[in-house]
Structures are given as C-alpha cells and as structure tokens.
C-alpha cells in the first residue's frame, strides 16, 4: 500500500470518528458536553504544567543531595509536598470529569441510536435486509469489511458494547494524544537546553549536533513506532472479528434459552451442544490468534519501555563523568527525556487500544449508516391513514398494490382491494403465497411494496407470533400502552372473554410470558389484548391456529361482535373451514402460470 493510500485511510478513519462524535457536541446537551471537554483539556494542560515544575524540582533537589545542602534539601521537600498535592487534585478531577463525560456521552449516543433503530421500523427492515446481502463480505487489507456492503449484524452489541467502547476510547485516546502533544512541546525545549551539543569528526571534517538528546529521543521513538505498527497491525482485523464471533456465540446461547422447551421435546440437546461448541471453537481460534499477536506486541513494548529507562543515562553519562553537568542536571535530563520519549511513544503505548478503537469505529459507522438508510422515507409503499375512527365511511382500501420478495420476485402486481364496515373478509392461499406479506404491506412495514393504502384509524393487527414483553402480566396485556390506562376489572374481563380465567389472579406476576405460556395460551392472550383495547378493525394472521375448534369459534364470535359494535370489520388469514363461517367475503391468492410477471393474483 502506498503512502498516499495509508494517509487517505487515516483521514477516512478520523472523518468517521468526527461524524460519530459531532452530533453529541451539537445536541441539546452541547453546552454541558463542551464545558466538560473544556474542563478536561484545562486539567490536562494543568497536569503538564505541574510536570514541568516537578522536572525543575528534580534539578534543585538532586543538586542539594550532591552538595549535602540540608537547608535546600528540606526546603525542596516542602515544595514537593504542595506540588504533589496540586498534581493529585488535578489528577483526581481529571479522572472524574473524564469518566463523567464518557458516561454522559454514552447515555446520549445509546438513546439516540436506540431511538433511530426503533423509528420508522428500522429494526424490522434491517433484520429483513440481513437475508438479502451478499453471502460473503470483501475486506480491507486490515481485515475489516468494506463499509456499506451489508446490514450489520448484532445490533444489540452495537448499542450495548460498541457505544461504550467508542465513547470511552474516543475521550481517553484523544485526551491522551493532546496530553502527549502538550508534554512534547513543554519538555522538548527543556531537553534541548540541557542536552548540549554532540561533536564528532568524519572524513576529516568536524560536525556538531545541537540538542543531541532530542534527536536521540526522536530516533528512538520513530524506530519503536514503526516496529510496533509492523507487529501490531493484524490486531485491527482480529479485534473486529473477535467481537463478531463473541456476539454470534452469545446470540445462539440466547436462542437456546428462548427455545428450550422445543429443543428438549425434539431431543436436540446434542445438536445444540455441537452448534454451540462450533461457535465457541471459532471464538477461541480467533482469540488464540489475537493473544498471539498481543504477546508479540506486549513483548516489544515492554522491551522498548525498559530500555527507555536507562537510555538517557547511557547517552548523558559521559558529560556527567567529565564534570560538565551535576547530578541534578543528569536527573533533570533523565526526567525530561522520559517525558519527551513518553510523548513520542504515545502511538507505541496505545497501539492495542487504537486497534480496538478503529475496529469499534468501523462497526458503529456501518451501523449508523444502515440506520440512516433505513430511516429515509421508503420509495415504495405510500401509506395514508384516515382521520376518522368509525362510521359508514371508514373503509380499508388499497390501489395499485405491488408486492415483491427480498429476492426481487413479484408476488402481486397492481392489485386493488376494498373492505367496507361489516364486510368480514377471509384471505386464503397456499403456504408461501404471500398472505402474511400482504398484511405487512397493509400495515406499512413491508419495504418491498408499491401502491396506495388507506387504513381505518382504529385498527389492530394480530401477527402469527405475538410479542409480549417480560414483566407483569398486566403490562404484557396492555402493551404497548401503559397498564395504568386500564382498570383491574377491565383487564380481568378481557382475560375471561379470551378463555383465560386462570390468569385473572396473576396480573401482577412478573415472568417471561412468551416462555411461560403455551402456544394456545399466547394466542388467547393476544386476542385478550384486542378485546381489552376494543378496536373497530381487526386484521388477524393465523390468530387461532393453535386452538381447538370450540375455542376458535368462541373467540371469533367475540371478535366479530366487537368489530360490528364499533362499526368495523375483520380481515383474517386462516386455513380452517370453521373460521370461514365468520366471514362473508373470501379473497384467494392463486398461483399464475409461467416464470415471468407476478407469481400470484388476488381474486
């Protein structure tokens, strides 16, 4: 890779960091954020100033020791006491304010990304888009995926872990870099003045190098930085891959817990153990590569650091033994060299953190870019919702409705449908014909759709797999509204009407209801939610498929009565003949012949 390409890559990374950081410092919290940042910068400058004072103290103190001057010795101990106290206060508040900025930034950024993830159905669209990306990602030379190639996986990791790493490392590394620059500028002049000149003869000519110790520090750190980058460069891609494999392993563990009953009934423990072991072996394999590279990096950085302890003494020793400098100046040279070398070695000392920072920034950048794409107004379905709530004019209509699969195949083309109040309609068709996809398009969440849809205002959807949050039963029943909106009598009546009288006494019991209840109980709980909220329109997708016929008929009778009282209608997807009795109209998705054009037509 050429130097210009490397430079372009560094600038691209810095632009990514700037793009991710700027929104917080321009947000509603901007003055607090900027104030904290300014205070941290001021404390860093104060810390460097105190180090300069301590460096000067070194010269006076050690000269007093060499000269056996007790008066100066005790005076300098007193001076050191207040220098140390001021430095400690600065260090404590620098740590506190840095942590405060990190946690405030993390809180804001997490909430911002979480809001964008849950807005405009972005979380749903991103999950759908995961299944249509390329099978493999091409990677950069550092082992990172090319940006924008496919939707990032594991959004939970991005929100919970990556935001925390990014904010802490951005603050920590940027302030560390600032501290290194200021330290270098403050001590390079001191070291230049103390180091004197180095004279030598070559080819009959005499040469003098002023500020010899400064040039030795630059040479020492340049060699160290180049070798560190050469040794540690693979850590960038390995860190990225480690986080991905850890998240995949964690995700599969959660799935085993969620589907524990089904796995136990299928006797699938051996298969799941093998799958988990395979994923964990992948985690370990990458981790072994990671620690192998870290071992090399740690070995070199420790060698580099230990050599730096004696290096200034070796270089300055001839001047000390010749009497050109005193012990105090030698110690001041050592201290100044240590500060200059430490500043110039910032890259060496932080290489592992820089690799992790870059990998985290790449992951968050891809996640943020995916959110931006998903939160843009979709170019497909235009969904208009009426302002009315009930009445004879309240209808469900769709015109010019075209549905596509993620693969690009067309399910329906230019379909039109209309349902008036009281026209209970049953949608049927073979499995995989797009019945649920049509419901998703009517709800406005299917991204591969075109057309105009008008929904009544007071409508509820019952999906095949209803969602119930962990927590109290009353919260699960009232979701997404607050349970306080409904009285205990209303909640209990809804449960009894949905044939769940046994749950009426458990409203305040907290549990994972999706795992606690059977499939039939979950379907009845979803219907109880509808009976509680009393919408005028109900669109049900296989809402009673796990129930026996008598229970199914009883619940459909109640749903039908509910919608008729409110001046609406039911639209259902179902296969059983018993459900057909509750619907006056029938829609059917029929397969069309041929490979070209839409796969189905709606009749």
Give names to the regions the model predicted.
Residues 1-51, 60-80, 94-98, 124-182, ...:
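Membrane-integrated ABC transporters
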Residues 29-54, 67-107, 147-148, 204-233, ...:
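Transmembrane-helix motif of ABC transporter permease domains
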Residues 39-42, 46, 176-205, 211-232, ...:
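A hydrophobic transmembrane-helix motif
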Residues 232-236, 247, 264-268, 274, ...:
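Cytosolic ends of transmembrane helices, especially the final helix of ABC transmembrane type-1 domains
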Residues 234-291:
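Loop segments that connect adjacent transmembrane helices in multi-pass transporters
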Residues 398-403, 408-425, 449-451:
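Conserved beta-strand
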Residues 441, 476, 509-603:
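ABC-family ATPase nucleotide-binding domain "signature/switch" substructure
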Residues 466-512:
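Conserved "ABC signature" C-loop
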